[in-house]
């Protein structure tokens, strides 16, 4: 099969300015490498070193290493042609190149690049040298605007469903996780085979109806990890929603679509669910506020379940006040006031990556917090894991069994483990859960437990499965305290750590409060953010 090649378009320069020798050939070679997804050639086209830049609508990548890592996880581009090429020399060995491209799929894209020749790289750094070739030092990519980004949305409208004409949430827009009933729309659960068999709902989930009654409108139905059985944020059928705060990073799941939509400004409220961290983890990865509510405080009627013992409704927002208003619109303003005392378990925090531990210690150093010990963290995790898996098999096992091959490999592996849990093991784990909850309630009381919302910053979308499994296990160890006790947990974007591609990446500070303190916990978080931020 012949390799696609970029053809030479008309080249435009200012009157009297000569075309820089070899530059257009370098531009066309780069475009040819893009069309062929020749990763090695693409890497070689960028100036090596920490100062090379590449930006697009998803964010900015700094350094040639970060750009190369991103490219390996992106895949190739579709066929397209160069329509126009503008060259503006800015010296003997530098030029700005602006390229208009016409994708075969329609629309127009605009590429702006700074090319340099004879790029001098600090020779003391291993692998760096001086090159006399033309290389890209800055690239900005503006692709055609898609009618809908299928990684984020299943369907959208302007609005999809209008809310009430007045209320505390008037003007707010909701990205609804694809687990909630919306009248006249089917639930897809992140799986096309499930969606194909689903009937349109004959009513709307009360958790969503409360937001509509307060004046918010539905922007669209947002993607979810399959059956909500993941905290990574990847979906093998629809793709991985982009993380605007960490380009090339996972958005976190399973409320991945709502998180991506809110973080990118496409909606102001994400309506999600949290079983093992499915609101807190995406909030942490994408720099959002996120609240997992008290278990059973918000109706789960007309909500596709994953694990009845732990499933809760939650919200994702870009600021604390919008989150407080969403919580109050659903739960009312009446709320138990948590004690102003803070609790920290250093052994629990030690589950997180070292960079997160250091950021947490620095953030909380000025707080008067009591040290506690929640007990054997591995035992708590195992109890949670078994009960969650047993519940998940009750909820979805019959369908999964009847549809072999319909579920992606990661989710299928978790359902396979769930299927192997015996009734005796499940009963034993449920008894242990009740005992753990009683003991932890006595330990935590009405105080607020502080811990990281996730064990790490957002991993790369190309991270190996063994690394994702490690991060998942560590993060669920942090998240399971709220799950086992049914307590609300708030994630606030107050920490940053080195990201997977260099630069800073967000990590949330988590506040676990007493049951029924949901609205007051958000208000406490707002005050704490003002104090620490």
Predicted regions and their residues:
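Amidase signature
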Residues: 3-4, 143-169, 332-476
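Short, well-ordered alpha-helical
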Residues: 89, 133-198, 228-229, 458
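Structural helix-boundary/capping segments
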Residues: 139-147, 151, 264, 269, ...
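Short glycine/serine-rich loop/turn segments
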Residues: 173-310, 454-466
